[in-house]
């Protein structure tokens, strides 16, 4: 019984050692690489495992590249993996570029991949151009009519400008700017509706793909709709603004006229008060004249008759009310 127990416990470390050997020495992967024409030693696979590089990713990528006729080494692929790159995507991009006769080196592909771009998708766009639909672009012609335009931009990836080149957003912004400029330079919106291809020609002549990761192949106007009459709307707004300014100025003049009228009324009242004050001094002056003998009693009555006659005439003509003031006879001594 002791002998059997010792034999059963002996198989455990042997099994663990065998599994550990298979982990560090991927024999099956080495055999696959050997029969696929990839020359990689078993110790290289062990060192990859020690450096925490998955040997299967490196070996499968090497097999794919070798079968496609690419000249790459395990060191280059392993270095790109350690740098954080997507090794399978780079290999697929290199194969696609090679079959399409596109000049793309392993160094360029890894640089594009490490720059954050999908290098395989970039090669696909370079082979099969991509169509970008622009959002609605509103522009106003010289006659004030608004036009709402949609365009389709056909682009092809520029492999040489993928690192550091602007993306789709820049293309869309530049195309929109070109459409606005082209429509704005048209004398009438009818010209744009009659010849929408003129917009495409003018936009293409501006070289909008400079400094971008794409090459613009064509710009096609998909739809042109007539919007609002912006010119008439602006004229109405301007007329309303002018009307409000005129009303404000008229109100200002009216207020000034009212102020002047009130001022004149105040001056008139002041003058009338002065007249009344002066008239109140007349009886005193006449009394003094009578006392001093400068006028006689008959002169006084003659003046009273003239005054009564004047009041009567004014009452008849309606120009004023008769003077009902009762003046007492002066005390003649």
Curated annotation (Swiss-Prot):
The keyword Methyltransferase does not apply. Pfam families: FloA (PF12127). The chain crosses the membrane at residues 11-31. Keywords: Cell membrane, Membrane, Transmembrane, Transmembrane helix. The keyword DNA-binding does not apply. Signal peptide: none annotated. It is a single-pass membrane protein. It is found in: Cell membrane; Membrane raft. GO terms for cellular component: membrane raft; plasma membrane. InterPro entries: FloA. Belongs to the flotillin-like FloA family. HAMAP family: FloA. Found in functional membrane microdomains (FMM) that may be equivalent to eukaryotic membrane rafts. FMMs are highly dynamic and increase in number as cells age. Flotillins are thought to be important factors in membrane fluidity. Homooligomerizes. This is Flotillin-like protein FloA.
């Amino acid at each position: 019984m002791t002998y059997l127990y010792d034999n059963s416990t002996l198989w455990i470390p042997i099994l663990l050692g065998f599994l550990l050997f298979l982990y560090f020495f991927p024999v099956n992967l080495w055999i696959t690489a050997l029969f696929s024409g990839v020359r990689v030693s078993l110790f290289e696979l062990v060192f990859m495992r020690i450096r925490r590089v998955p040997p299967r990713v490196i070996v499968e990528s090497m097999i794919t590249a070798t079968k496609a006729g690419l000249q790459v080494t395990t060191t280059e692929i392993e270095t790109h993996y350690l740098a954080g790159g997507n090794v399978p995507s780079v290999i697929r991009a290199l194969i696609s570029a090679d079959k399409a006769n596109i000049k793309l080196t392993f160094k360029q592909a890894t640089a594009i991949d490490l720059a954050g771009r999908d290098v395989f998708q970039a090669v696909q766009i370079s082979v099969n151009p991509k169509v970008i639909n622009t959002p609605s672009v509103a522009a106003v012609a010289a006659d004030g009519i608004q036009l709402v335009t949609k365009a389709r931009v056909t682009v092809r990836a520029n492999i040489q400008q993928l690192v550091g080149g602007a993306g789709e957003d820049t293309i869309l912004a530049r195309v929109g700017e070109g459409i606005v400029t082209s429509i704005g330079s048209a004398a009438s919106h009818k010209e744009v509706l009659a010849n929408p291809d003129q917009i495409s020609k003018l936009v293409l002549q501006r070289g909008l793909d400079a400094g971008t990761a794409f090459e613009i192949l064509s710009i096609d106007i998909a739809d042109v709709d007539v919007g609002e009459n912006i010119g008439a709307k602006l004229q109405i707004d301007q007329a309303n603004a002018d009307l409000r300014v005129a009303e404000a100025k008229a109100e200002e003049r009216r207020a000034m006229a009212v102020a002047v009228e009130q001022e004149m009324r105040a001056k008139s009242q002041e003058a009338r008060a002065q007249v009344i004050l002066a008239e109140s001094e007349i009886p005193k002056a006449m009394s003094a004249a009578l006392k001093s003998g400068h006028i006689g009693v008959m002169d006084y009555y003659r003046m009273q008759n003239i005054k009564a006659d004047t009041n009567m005439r004014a009452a008849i003509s309606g120009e004023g009310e008769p003077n009902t003031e009762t003046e007492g006879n002066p005390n003649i001594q």
